[in-house]
Amino acid sequence: MTARAIIIGAPRSGSGKTSVTIGILRALTRRGLKVRGAKSGPDYIDPGFHTAATGLSGVNLDSWAMPPSLLNALAAQQADDTDFVILESAMGLFDGIPAAPGRTGSAADLARLYGLPVLLVLDVSGQSTTAAAVAKGFATYDPDVRMAGVVLNRLGSERHRKLSGDAIEAIGLPVVGAILRDPTLNLPERHLGLVQAGEYDDLMAHLDRLADMAEKSLDLDAVMRLATPLAPAAGGFADALQPPGQRIALAEDGAFTFLYPHVAAYWRKAGAEIVPFSPLADEAPDDSCDVCWLPGGYPELHAGKLAAAETFKAGMARFAATKPIHGECGGFMVLGEALEDASGETHRMLGLLGHATSFAKRKMNLGYREARLRADCPLGAQGALIRGHEFHYAQMTATGNDEPLADLADGLGNPIGASGYRRGHVSGTFFHAIARASA
């Protein structure tokens, strides 16, 4: 069975795409359909909500970071034995980076590649008939990206709905949803985006409220009729990040949460065993594992507890003496000597690398990254080219004396310089690895 699919797009972030996407996913799941979510680009938070809403794994589909073969393989995997795939756009529908055609990282790339229709979510607060001009611009901007319908979001009244909706339908686009303003439907955010799905005490209740909204305010049958088959060309996993070991000790708790779903899924698919442990519960990596991986997350919110986790710290030092450890972003921060939290208090970290970081001295670092490894590490062999994404506010306050791990370029190929560190069996970077670049 091959799924039918539709892209949920918008002019910008904050238009309501995520709430509409989750509402549709949860509502269709409650109807007994097999539905999966996907997210364009490198945002690793939204797939967690997609998974919670459906009970089936979400995935990122990133046309810049993933070579076409891997992109097709992951898209086909989402479509297999599934009724519908709802693909949520990052940012605005056409937003990406200047790159080769089809490799910009935008959701529009996926619409062209797979011939998928777009359901356009318009935040019409502060406007009415002007929304039709916006919709017409989207409908005519790129003839290879087809707008199939519109959802009006944040309406103030029935009159507001009629003015906006009639103008849009007059240009030939069906309006399949009209959502009144309701701040209680908003998902809470913090500095790296939405608060993660696993942090909600009443997550399912909120997802069901979004599903109730979708049932009430959207014509879900019409949305399903707009979807078209998702049938990617043949793909493969040669460019996936290979398992760094047969048994992988993976830090997994409220401080360590940012691991791309497709990365862990492929490790398992390739035969590796993932053995989770919780640094916040003062657990050490299992000594029987071959490698330890500290993913990103929010260690700055738990720095005091991590600093006091003596079993964790001793176990990591013991592991590092003979086996590889790699940290990404938040994990990289914990591998260093010290971490200053937002209040200015400094906490001792693992000291397996010599750098120190601060969350009190904040500056956003954001963008695609391409890294050529200077040495063998859990990311790959020396000389390997890895594509990923960097998004953090922490700043380096001390660099230490460790060797650089990689030479970094931004998404446009502009050199950024040496990045990350390595010492003995330990390595770390601020960027999150997504895939290997094609040879």
UniProtKB/Swiss-Prot annotation:
Its EC number is 6.3.5.9. GO terms for biological process: cobalamin biosynthetic process. The record marks 432 as: Increases nucleophilicity of active site Cys. It catalyses: hydrogenobyrinate + 2 L-glutamine + 2 ATP + 2 H2O = hydrogenobyrinate a,c-diamide + 2 L-glutamate + 2 ADP + 2 phosphate + 2 H(+). The active site is at 329 (nucleophile). GO terms for molecular function: ATP binding; cobyrinic acid a,c-diamide synthase activity; hydrogenobyrinic acid a,c-diamide synthase (glutamine-hydrolysing) activity. InterPro entries: CbiA/CobB_synth, Class_I_gatase-like, CobQ/CobB/MinD/ParA_Nub-bd_dom, GATase_3, P-loop_NTPase. Its cofactor is Mg(2+). Keywords: ATP-binding, Cobalamin biosynthesis, Glutamine amidotransferase, Ligase, Magnesium, Nucleotide-binding. The keyword Thylakoid does not apply. Residues 247-439 form the GATase cobBQ-type domain. Pathway: Cofactor biosynthesis; adenosylcobalamin biosynthesis; cob(II)yrinate a,c-diamide from precorrin-2 (aerobic route): step 9/10. Pfam families: CbiA, GATase_3. Disulfide bonds: none annotated. The keyword Protein transport does not apply. Comprises of two domains. The C-terminal domain contains the binding site for glutamine and catalyzes the hydrolysis of this substrate to glutamate and ammonia. The N-terminal domain is anticipated to bind ATP and hydrogenobyrinate and catalyzes the ultimate synthesis of the diamide product. The ammonia produced via the glutaminase domain is probably translocated to the adjacent domain via a molecular tunnel, where it reacts with an activated intermediate. Belongs to the CobB/CbiA family. The a and c carboxylates of hydrogenobyrinate are activated for nucleophilic attack via formation of a phosphorylated intermediate by ATP. CobB catalyzes first the amidation of the c-carboxylate, and then that of the a-carboxylate. HAMAP family: CobB_CbiA. Catalyzes the ATP-dependent amidation of the two carboxylate groups at positions a and c of hydrogenobyrinate, using either L-glutamine or ammonia as the nitrogen source. This is Hydrogenobyrinate a,c-diamide synthase. The lineage of its organism: Bacteria, Pseudomonadati, Pseudomonadota, Alphaproteobacteria, Hyphomicrobiales. The gene is cobB.
